[in-house]
Amino acid sequence: MPSVASAAVPTPRRPFRTRLVVAALATLAVLAGCSEGATTTVSRQSPERGTPDAGAAGSELSWAGCTDDMAAAAGLECATLEVPLDPAQPEGEQIELALARKRFTGPDDQRIGSLVFNPGGPGGSGIEFLASAAVMVPQELGDRFDMVSFDPRGVGDSSPVRCIDDATKDEQLTGDLSPDTEEELQRAIEDQQEFIDGCRTNSPELLEHMSTADVAADLDRIREAVGDETLSYVGFSYGTSIGSVYASLFPDKVRALVLDGSVSPDAAPEEEVIAQGRGFERTLQSFIEHCNADPECALAPDAAGTIDRVRAELAQDPVEVEDPTGTRAMGSDLFDLALGTALYDTTVWGTAARAISDVRGGGAELLFALADQQTGRQPDGSYDNSSDAQSMVACADQEERPTLEAGRAAAERIAAALPELGQTFAWGALACLDWPEAANPLPRIDAADAPPILVVGTLGDPATPYEWSEEMTAALGSARLLTYEGDGHTAFLRGGPCVDDAVTAYLLDGTLPAEGTRCPAQEDSVSFAGLRDEIVSQFVDIGLPQQVAECVVDGAIGEVGEVEFDRMVLTRDEELQAIVQQHSMRCALGG
């Protein structure tokens, strides 16, 4: 949300989105190639078992093919589930949740149940996530679990909330996102009040029922609806808050919980802002060090100096770019938002470096694409509702309501604590200024009575610093910590075989990694070669022959150009899906 809470480096927590987009494109590439007689197969796309609406015994859901193109291409089925608006009144007003599943592919007698995923946010669509991630999940899990995800209440297709319109979001995001004068601060406060008033007007019913505790209650209804006695769950980033609250409220309903990239279990707002700011500072320093040591990095040998110079230039003279909605201006605040987004995923470090070095060439388009990943802006200028939901959840969870005076004092302390990003994060403690009172704030995290839980923490995680995973492990009272020594946000499905094998073993039979297990960063986890090589590599991983993968990617780049190709990947542009399918069919036929 653009407001006094809006740090130019983002607070929403969404894992490895670019990798998910690539996985989705790879799925389309494989399917398109197979449709033209190619021999390549992807076992995770095997024909589904059972009838189209089949579920586990006791399931109350009616499953049917998804209508979304990407979900349908991934072989997902969709359903809706009614849940109470207020979990404390189960017979009261109901709302609808949108669910999706990918059916298990192994023998019927080997099925364990459903494995539910949440991608984080708050505000992340689980259905969009599953459409991309299903093909990345280890085969051993796909053989034995129905993979299930959902759009949490208020998000995506689940009774979506909406606070302000697209034009107002554009206007607020072009304002000053890190106010440093009284006039700028008052404008930011006015923007926040406009946002809150919009939530009250457009989504009054959900305004008081968007807390994580409410979502945890929905998760238990999903468990019941799919017919499972106990829950198997993987939560990334903010999804760890859902999982930890679930384990605290329903410890006897837990089978296996993986919490990857934990949020803080109990930090006060100011402490949370400082910890996250330090996480981004550490990862920015890692980006700079890796860049300076790599001759392929466009910012080498002085990445820090170039970043500072470009930021200063944009503060004085923003770069204007034309898009379908008109003229957009890339200033220093949106530049920091784009840079912060890039720090989430080492996959895009090379692209970000090239964009910064050529900001007045084609780079601004790529920087906008990175910033738009966080704000939810689509290529046509519309917005999804992720930022609306993110703000509503954050303030529904937070019991405190700051005063402006306390916020000013906190801003000074935050700025002093963060030498590199202090002004960017300074006003984060005022995120819930003037919000309605929280009806159902976060409960105390304590799951000592639950079965063992697996927490995964990444040393170089900017958005959910490693120490939060340590704190979550201690707070749960029943958890084991697995450490990934790399950079980026979260580790499962991106941290290599060491992480994936440990998580898979735990989900299959409850086997925890040994106390103190640390997985080393993959040798190729950081590359400044750009998206082309990364995409080819992932296409090969998913089942395309090397020659075909290179043919598809190079054909797409040749058609639209490298900068536009990277932009389309970063923005999940639907036109790129058609381009990839076209070249997949051509390359499968030897064209």
Question: Which residues are covered by each model-predicted region?
Answer:
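Alpha/beta-hydrolase fold nucleophile elbow
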Residues: 228-238
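Conserved alpha/beta-hydrolase "acid-adjacent" motif
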Residues: 462-467
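Catalytic-loop region of hydrolases
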Residues: 2-4, 13-14, 19-22, 34-177, ...
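Conserved acidic catalytic loop of the alpha/beta-hydrolase fold
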Residues: 201-205, 216-230
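Alpha/beta-hydrolase fold active-site neighborhood
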Residues: 304-451, 495, 563, 567-571
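C-terminal motif of bacterial Sec signal peptides marking the signal peptidase cleavage site
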Residues: 29-33
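Catalytic histidine neighborhood in serine/cysteine hydrolases
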Residues: 99, 476-490
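A catalytic-pocket lid/entrance helix-loop region that shapes and gates access to the active site
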Residues: 162-174, 245-306, 354-369, 373-378
